[in-house]
Swiss-Prot record:
Alphabetized InterPro entries for the sequence: Ac_CoA_lig, ACAS_N, AMP-bd_C, AMP-bd_C_sf, AMP-binding_CS, AMP-dep_synth/lig_dom, ANL_N_sf
CDD domains associated with the record: ACS
The keyword ATP-binding appears for this protein: yes
Protein name in UniProt: Acetyl-coenzyme A synthetase
Assigned protein family: Belongs to the ATP-dependent AMP-binding enzyme family.
Source organism per UniProt: Helicobacter pylori (strain ATCC 700392 / 26695) (Campylobacter pylori)
Function: Catalyzes the conversion of acetate into acetyl-CoA (AcCoA), an essential intermediate at the junction of anabolic and catabolic pathways. AcsA undergoes a two-step reaction. In the first half reaction, AcsA combines acetate with ATP to form acetyl-adenylate (AcAMP) intermediate. In the second half reaction, it can then transfer the acetyl group from AcAMP to the sulfhydryl group of CoA, forming the product AcCoA.
Length: 662
């Protein structure tokens, strides 16, 4: 019954609020189509004009796009720029007393940072990194920090002196942190003693200590610690230094480093299907331009707006839409420490009311959880300040979309259901709030200048209603530049599978359907990546972790639909020596495997279901048929070709076990 209602609701068209559309930057579909036409007519001129108008340059670029070494594209060649200057200094003339950041801690503390204050703190932090830690242009700095204002200072300080930051999500394990430190060959690691979560101290420094123990990260010279929750922690003499004790001795004047357009801005590690995380490398100018443009187009950001993106800075959404995008626009961005549920499920709605939030951007997982746990909470608060709502990280189901639209947006706010990736830097497909007629759960249309198409494996376009591979067929400024230290993997991952007009195109790894109006609906991953609560987790790294359990001979992990998280993890496990386990033992084994996952990856990786099987379905070449296992996990009919299987009986045995467990 609910499915039928969802399907019917998903067909409805919602036009932009007329009053909002009148004052929007892009007011209707004609204006959208004009921009698309302009970009198509002269692609390089379109992007070059935007870069000249929107960014402040120390030296103008002399070439918009260099494709000579494709797919290693270069944008705005030979231009000189600094990202921190564009996010802070250029606003000081007219906006020095404007609020740049509003911070609210979980324990009720808050802080308001003006652009003048931000300038001072970033400069002092930059001088600290230079003078006391010898951080120079091109050095890598790992930031393992919670959602506090000092995290933003660290990011911008790195950009000011030309260091490359790599933020590691504060929920990741010491092992995951160690892997990223070593891959980046980081010189300095910055962390906090801890933070607050669900009303209690949550410690980070012990994880760093474990990551660095026994000289496991030889590139690291020192660690810088921000005191946040003031709990007692251990210090390593000569290695660990306290930020709070040192920063105020530094000058608040620091000239920004002149950076080339293509100089790396940051590395951000994302899950790869091979198990080893990929260090996605983004450039300075191209990334920042698109961060600013998508803020202006997709959120229609205005001078007096309070913008709140709930993402953690450890993810690309936090980079682009908590920090760089809002600050490049001279807007006010909100930062929240802790969870949505503490002290209760009304916390986010109280924040919107108290800080008069205009544009609100969050994940479908959060929406589903708030709907399930606190459906009536929004009615207790005044949410009339909201003008645009946004979703990110995964497809949103119609039921959650409907609740978000009606109960949070009061049926008057456009929902911008954005599709993009760590690798794209910013939005690729999204409605425009003043122009695009929207449908529930539909990403709608590519943004101007973006050539996103749904293709078959042979490079032909799919017919309306047919599922295909979502590709981007022309380079764009904010695209990934490389995988750190692994050019071959960069090409193999993104530019080696589908050709259009004889040239390889960017393969997103997502499946999609385009309708007769050109609207694109995202289906989900087509590779071995599972999207859990908006976090991309590689099944290979999950399998590698749980295989470390002494009772596990081999395993295969697939993603299955989850009402709250979007996708959950389902493991098919073969026990050593054909061992079997009863219900109690199987539950204990599940608990132990999840403990291993929390250590190896972090608490975001957790098995929801396990099926103990005698073997795994493999082709004669030894490849596990995960699509077949996914069908079994989802209780769908088996439609895959079984002729290449080494042993068809394995499938029959697994299906028999599945039927018994129903």
């Amino acid at each position: 019954m609910q499915l039928d209602e969802d399907l019917e609701f998903a067909k409805k068209i919602f036009n932009p609020n007329r009053a909002f559309a009148k004052q929007a930057r892009i007011k209707n579909m004609c204006e959208y189509k004009d921009l698309v036409h302009e970009a198509n007519e002269d692609y390089e001129h379109f992007w070059g004009d935007l870069a000249k108008q929107k960014l402040t340059w120390f030296k103008p670029f002399d070439k918009v796009l260099n494709s000579d070494n494709a797919p290693f594209f270069k944008w705005f060649e030979n231009g000189k720029i600094n990202v921190s200057y564009n996010c802070i200094d250029r606003h000081l003339k007219d906006k020095k007393n404007k609020v740049a950041i509003i911070f609210e801690g979980e324990m009720g503390d808050y802080n308001v940072i003006t652009y003048r204050k931000l300038h001072s703190e970033v400069n002092k932090t930059a001088n600290l990194l230079k003078n006391e830690f010898n951080v120079k242009k091109g050095d890598r700095v790992i930031i393992y920090m919670p959602m506090i204002v000092e995290s933003v200072y660290m990011m911008l300080a790195c950009t000011r002196i030309g260091a490359i930051h790599s933020i590691v999500f504060a929920g990741f394990s010491p092992e995951a942190l160690r892997d990223r430190i070593n891959d980046a060959q980081a010189k300095l690691v910055i962390t906090a003693d801890g933070t607050f979560r669900k009303g209690k101290p949550y410690m980070l420094k012990p994880a760093l200590d474990k990551a660095l123990e026994n000289n496991a990260c030889p590139s690291v010279e020192k660690a810088l610690i921000v005191i946040r929750n003031a709990k007692e922690i251990d210090y390593v003499r000569g290695r660990d230094f306290v930020y709070n004790e040192m920063v105020n001795y530094q000058s608040d004047k620091c000239e920004p480093e002149m950076m080339d357009s293509e100089d790396p801005l940051f590395l951000l590690y994302t899950s790869g299907s091979t198990g080893k995380p990929k260090g996605v490398q983004h450039s300075s100018a191209g990334y920042l331009l698109w961060a600013q443009m998508t803020m202006e187009w997709v959120f229609d950001i205005r001078d007096n707006d309070n913008f709140w993106c709930t993402a953690d800075i450890g993810w690309i959404t936090g980079h682009t839409y908590v920090v760089y995008g809002p600050l490049a626009c001279g807007a006010t961005t909100l930062i929240l420490e802790g969870t949505m549920s503490y002290p209760d499920y009304g916390r986010w709605w109280r924040m919107i009311e108290e800080y008069r939030v205009d544009k609100f951007y969050t994940s479908p997982t959060a929406i589903r959880m708030l709907h399930a746990k606190g459906e009536n909470e929004p009615s207790k608060y005044n949410l009339e300040s909201l003008k645009v709502l946004g979703t990110v990280g995964e497809p949103i189901n119609p039921t959650a979309w409907k609740w978000f639209y009606e109960k949070i947006g009061n049926s008057k706010c456009s929902i911008v259901d954005t599709w993009w990736q760590t690798e794209t830097g910013g939005h690729i497909i999204s409605p425009l709030p003043g122009a695009t007629p929207i449908r529930a759960s539909c990403a709608t249309l590519p943004l101007p200048g973006i050539h996103a198409e749904v293709l078959n494996e042979d490079g032909t376009k799919t017919k309306p209603g047919e599922q295909g591979f979502l590709c981007i067929t022309k380079p764009w400024p904010s695209m990934i530049r490389n995988i750190w230290g692994d050019e071959k993997r960069y090409i193999d991952s993104y530019f080696s599978q589908i050709k259009l007009n004889g040239e390889y195109v960017y393969l997103s790894g997502d499946g999609a359907i385009v309708d007769e109006n050109g609207y694109i609906t995202i289906i989900g991953r087509t590779d071995d990546i599972v999207n859990v609560s908006g976090h991309r987790i590689g099944t290979a790294e999950v399998e590698s972790a749980i295989s470390k359990h002494e009772m596990v001979a081999e395993c295969a992990v697939v993603g299955i639909p989850d009402a709250i998280k979007g996708e959950g993890l389902f493991a098919f496990v073969v026990l050593c020596d054909g061992a079997k386990c009863n219900l109690g033992e199987s539950l204990e084994l599940l608990k132990e495997m999840n403990h291993i996952l929390s250590i190896e990856i972090g608490k975001i990786a957790k098995l929801d279901n396990v099926m103990y099987v005698p073997g795994l379905p493999k082709t004669r070449s030894g490849k596990i048929m995960r699509r077949l296992l996914k069908s079994i996990a989802k209780k769908e009919p088996i439609t895959q070709d079984l002729s290449t299987l080494e042993d068809v009986n394995v499938v029959k045995e697994i299906m028999s076990i599945a039927q018994m467990e129903e």
